[in-house]
Amino acid sequence: GGMVIDTQSDLPHARQMIKMFGKVWPAMPKRVVNTHEDSDHVFGNQLFEGAEIIGHRSLPERMKKVAEPEEIQGLMEAANGAVKGFLLKLVHPGLVAAGRQLDEDYDFSGIELVPPTTLFDDRLEIMLDDAEVHIIHVGPCHEVGDALIWMPKERVLFAGDVLFRLCTPMGWVGTYEKWFETLDMIVDELKPEVIVPGHGPLCGVEGATEMKAYLEYVRNESRAFFDKGLKAGEAARKIDLGPYSDWLCPERIYMNIERAYREFRNEPFDKPWDQAKTFDEIYRVARARGIVPTF
């Protein structure tokens, strides 16, 4: 019995989560589901020893590419080193800011990358005691392995990072159209009463509707900037955020504009991101808007 969906960004936060749900469940869960491959959803996997860990078939290889704890630790050490940090900031101020923020918020020591042990392709249906659980692959929207966890009887949906609530999304791999299709499926087919987003507070289907409206707005505005010949970074500094100005982390809009630009240029949807350049652009957008960047 018992199932955990995603396992936090580091071991201290994962242990805190285990302690919290220990108040309502007497034993460690026997199942874990990773909604996708990003580090903030899988870095606590190792604490669930003996549990069945479920994820899309792409996750083991994708985790090696995007969730290597050694790389994150190296970034933090470089950002905080007196000489290295100073020199790195001259070249990549955003990368240094990201490394220092991660160091303040998380402790990545002792993390071992533990991939899912049960892999699925399109859909996996399991029984959790008397509750039916559908795990549905919908990626790539935010990432390759995006999966929804749907409980039809309870009408509860765990959306992973397919849905950010009142928080600017970041799309690493995928297309706008794929993301639109998935959000439409949530609203028109699943019709959940409660949605647990990957980031942000609980919501109903209005969260998916708002998310789609945001993405449509950004793509349309990006088209206008693209046609005028502005670079994505320039567009991110100039765009009117309109009704989304109060969303957290508005500077991340750079990634969403750059994703739109890639589509306009007919570039591959899985083209790798230059992490240093991306964080630097996010940093510059934040500075231009007079806010502290959040990575």
What are these regions (language model features)?
Residues 1-23, 147-160:
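Conserved beta-strand hairpin/beta-sheet module of binuclear metal-dependent hydrolase folds
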Residues 5-7, 28-38, 54-56, 138, ...:
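Active-site neighborhood of phospho(di)ester-bond hydrolases with catalytic His/Asp-centered motifs
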Residues 6, 21, 36, 48, ...:
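Divalent metal-coordination and catalytic microenvironments
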Residues 12-55, 191:
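Active-site metal-binding motif and surrounding structural segment of the metallo-beta-lactamase
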Residues 64-137, 183:
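Metallo-beta-lactamase
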Residues 132-189:
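Active-site-proximal loop/helix segments of hydrolase catalytic cores
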Residues 177-242:
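Divalent-metal (often Zn2+) His-rich catalytic cores of metallo-beta-lactamase-fold enzymes
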Residues 228-295:
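C-terminal regulatory/interaction regions
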